[in-house]
Amino acid sequence: MPQHDQLHRYLFENFAVRGELVTVSETLQQILDNHNYPQSVKTVLAELLVATSLLTATLKFAGDITVQLQGDGPLSLAVINGNNQQQMRGVARVQGDIPDNADLKTLVGNGYLVITITPEEGERYQGVVGLEGDTLAACLEDYFLRSEQLPTRLFIRTGDVDGKPAAGGMLLQVMPAQNAQAEDFDHLAMLTETIKSEELLTLPANDVLWRLYHEEEVTLYDPQEVEFKCTCSRERCAGALKTLPDEEVDSILAEEGEIDMHCDYCGNHYLFNAMDIAEIRNNASPADPQVH
């Protein structure tokens, strides 16, 4: 059995091409746990999670990537945020009834794929592409073609392992500033495309690579753990409250007796009463009653 929730990087010794392989289960489950999504939406989030993990692994700096789908369909928003430490979180917004077998275009409608790269130091970059492909992988390949001009292929699979949702994916990309032959890249892509969901989700990474590339020389590097981690905090909520007009905050307190701020990503609730608000306005740190 593979060790799920790990990202593996690998390199072809005889080609200027690098690869990534990721499988997720527990991380995906934690993203889905706090919501009652239709099956088709769960599948989209699973694919987004895999894609975001693969994309963050391409970062050459400390920072994060947000990959989101937005459109005028019943799935108005699906977003996964991850950083270079492979810490992931995600959420979707759904309206109306959605069939379990709805495809991407039916779910999102007329929409866009938005990729936001935020370095810890430096300027933020955002790329937007229309949802012209039939799959998320095809849309992401279009993004790479337009933004980085690096030949890139993604292969994403979803399924279940031991009765729990799981997903996996592989990325192939020509190395920057290298003269990879197009036929070499196409050859490796054809091999990778043969990977089956069951193989990717149930076999160890080295077995997957052997099945796909046993005639090639491949170096597999040490894995990186993938985990769910939400960045919400009481301090961040307090900072958000501080930006609201006093009259609006006071009105909510008068009606409700306290302010309940809910994190869509992890389900945490942060409660603020009148004394907390007074402390926020005086730049003090409020006490920390957090409700899960």
From Swiss-Prot:
It comes from Salmonella typhi. Keywords: Chaperone, Cytoplasm, Disulfide bond, Redox-active center, Zinc. Disulfide bonds join 230-232, 263-266. InterPro entries: Heat_shock_Hsp33 (IPR000397), Heat_shock_Hsp33_C (IPR016154), Heat_shock_Hsp33_N (IPR016153), Hsp33_helix_hairpin_bin_dom_sf (IPR023212). Redox regulated molecular chaperone. Protects both thermally unfolding and oxidatively damaged proteins from irreversible aggregation. Plays an important role in the bacterial defense system toward oxidative stress. Coiled coil: none annotated. GO terms for biological process: protein refolding. Its main location: cytoplasm. Belongs to the HSP33 family. It is found in: Cytoplasm. It holds the Pfam family HSP33. Under oxidizing conditions two disulfide bonds are formed involving the reactive cysteines. Under reducing conditions zinc is bound to the reactive cysteines and the protein is inactive. GO terms for cellular component: cytoplasm. The keyword Lipid biosynthesis does not apply. The lineage of its organism: Bacteria, Pseudomonadati, Pseudomonadota, Gammaproteobacteria, Enterobacterales. This is 33 kDa chaperonin. One of its GO terms (molecular function) is unfolded protein binding.
